[in-house]
UniProtKB/Swiss-Prot annotation:
This is 6-phosphogluconate dehydrogenase, decarboxylating. Pathway: Carbohydrate degradation; pentose phosphate pathway; D-ribulose 5-phosphate from D-glucose 6-phosphate (oxidative stage): step 3/3. Gene3D superfamilies: 6-Phosphogluconate Dehydrogenase, domain 3, N-(1-d-carboxylethyl)-l-norvaline Dehydrogenase, domain 2, NAD(P)-binding Rossmann-like Domain. NADP(+) binds at G10, L11, A12, V13, M14, G15, N33, R34, S35, I75, K76, A77, N103. Belongs to the 6-phosphogluconate dehydrogenase family. The gene is gnd. Its EC number is 1.1.1.44. Homodimer. GO terms for biological process: D-gluconate metabolic process; organic acid catabolic process; pentose-phosphate shunt. It holds the Pfam family 6PGD. PANTHER family: 6-PHOSPHOGLUCONATE DEHYDROGENASE (PTHR11811).
Amino acid sequence: MAPADIGLIGLAVMGKNLVLNMIDHGFAVSVYNRSPEKTEEFLKEHGENISLQGFTAIEEFVQSLKRPRKIMIMIKAGAPVDEMISSLLPFLEEGDILIDGGNSYYLDSERRYIDLKKKGILFVGMGVSGGEEGARKGPSIMPGGNIEAWPVIAPIFQSIAAQVDGQPCCSWIGTGGAGHFVKAVHNGIEYGDIQLICETYEILKSRLDLSLEQIGNIFFEWNQTDLNSYLMGASAAVLTAKDENGVAVASTILDVAGQKGTGRWVAEDAIKAGVPMSLIIESVLARYLSAWKEVRRQAAREFPVASLLYQPSQEASVLIEDAREALYAAKIISYAQGFMLLKQISEERNWDLNLGELALIWRGGCIIQSAFLDKIHQGFESCPDAHSLMLQDYFKNVLLNSETGFRRAILHAVGAGVAIPCLASALAFYDGYRTENSPLFLVQGLRDYFGAHGYERQDRPRGEFYHTDWLGSKNASRM
């Protein structure tokens, strides 16, 4: 059989569907899995395809590939990736390409890029988003690492990626771990999107006593507006789905949300970088809190909702519109925070990320795909140096016009004792971001009082620090 165009290791859901996607686009693929039975099972299902070869010996797998060899690894992140790379190296030659398509931490990808470059192997850390359906029909693909690999692998991955307006949702991101970092931020934004939708659902449920189906239908309507997105449509579908007995499927799901860790990575990276990514952080914490099901059940008995809570008088239609405005405004703020982190890390690592291009890559094939991303692209095109999306004309006007409804929706939630960590965090960030003179002068004054850390003065140039003799003369001296 003729040599294959690409090899793929790891026949879990994503790997299998990527293989089938590649074959559909005319590429011959060799596959390998550490568990031979998975390879054999996959071949039984699809072995009639002349573009597919399966191997149970890694050396034979490597030798089946065209040179330079292109091998995509789709296995669990962490040590398993390093172990797989080590097992491949004895059979590789200079110029061969290794592609890690899993959810690896970007600093691991940086390390692998550097180590493999010394050995003459071209490493690519590739973010792949879209889940099972995206992998099969066209994902959003975020490749980064060794730029020398891109001309060789671009024809494959730009062919299998989602297409929007005739453009592939796949373009080169940057060196080192740039691809995996962008994918992680994508996942963090996804966490925020999902949590905001959940909180909006709870406001409508608690204040208007609407059913799952009624709220699902509202979400279907909102999906025809500026809130149009994969997640809004999926949320509507989940809320309205009924089983064969007519029971709402969502009513049977335990309110304990899992996570794979990428959201936590982004939260930690934001804190290390000094970027106030409050929504993504709150969305991660909300999932941790959800895991305390038994504790929450007990606390619900111990702390019943007070009967004299604030209840603003309002027509249902007005509250529904306020909730929609709050969701859209918070979504803008969440994405603004995500792009702030992308910009900050890009500058620190000299990646020169094209933020407008990233918005285009995410328009199709991925979990956060939405019409909203076109607005982000246009914003960066017209105002590339703006500190935040919030300062770009379109988003600025939306925030100004929706502020009243946003605040009313928050009041409804607080008045009903509804936990809205992300919506509340979004409003707090908005208010803090536009506060010229904040009370944090007191923080720095206290730091100087008990720790002699010094402070900058309003009437002096930035960068000059002073210390006050708080317990003595109260006079300040330059440090």
